[in-house]
Amino acid sequence: MTDSYDKLLEKAKDVLSSSTKNIDRLKIPEPEIIREGKATIIRNFQDIIDIINRDPDQVIKFLTRELGTNIVQNGRRLIINKKVTLEELQEKMNEYINTYVRCYECGSLDTEIQKSGRVSLLVCKACGAQHPIHTVKEFKEEEGIEEGKEYTVEISEVGSSGEGRASFRGFTIFVPGTKKGETVKVKIKKIKNDVAIAEVVSRTSDKK
């Protein structure tokens, strides 16, 4: 049975790999900073915005909150009203990108934010995944899954081979014998990187 799960896991990774083969086509440039008095200038701010395809006002709002200072955009440049190191800027930009831009499943930057009621969803154009946006704190509080443990997941799509797929805590979980829209309790059988194979323990319909 272990060999069967290993084969399923390799097949699952091949499926994800083929569906996201172009995720590296978008490259985010490193912030180019200069000093003007006490201010820090990101000379290529608009270049970064053009790549990540986000509202610059939202990025500025995030950086203002994180850096605790006044920030304004001037043309293609961003003016930060205090001295900030390149390392600090990279850390904050990576935090923004990993929360609001990068797909939680395949890592693609080709995403957009959509509203569903009061919930903001990160929608991936590369793999089709849709996830409520999580803060870094929320990720840390519930990161990871473990082999042998049980989790309740919702099947978000069904692959061409009939296997259900669920997105959970940054993992793509393949669950054979499930249908799109089902909520099931599963046991994790095998994990490799950010892909897992699971089997159904119970279904919501089983409790009715």
Swiss-Prot record:
Name assigned to this protein: Translation initiation factor 2 subunit beta
Transmembrane segments: none
Keyword GTP-binding: no
Superkingdom field: Archaea
Record-annotated TRAM domain positions: 144-202
HAMAP family: eIF_2_beta (MF_00232)
Any one Gene Ontology molecular-function term assigned to this protein's record: translation initiation factor activity
Organism expressing this protein natively: Thermoplasma volcanium (strain ATCC 51530 / DSM 4299 / JCM 9571 / NBRC 15438 / GSS1)
Coiled coil: none
Keywords: Initiation factor, Protein biosynthesis
SMART domains associated with the record: eIF2B_5
Family named by the database record: Belongs to the eIF-2-beta/eIF-5 family.
Annotated InterPro entries: IF2/IF5 (IPR045196), NA-bd_OB-fold (IPR012340), TIF2_bsu_arc (IPR004458), TRAM_dom (IPR002792), Transl_init_fac_IF2/IF5_dom (IPR002735), Transl_init_fac_IF2/IF5_N (IPR016189), Transl_init_fac_IF2/IF5_Zn-bd (IPR016190)
Summary of subunit composition and partner proteins: Heterotrimer composed of an alpha, a beta and a gamma chain.
PANTHER family: EUKARYOTIC TRANSLATION INITIATION FACTOR, EUKARYOTIC TRANSLATION INITIATION FACTOR 2 SUBUNIT 2
Job of this protein: eIF-2 functions in the early steps of protein synthesis by forming a ternary complex with GTP and initiator tRNA.
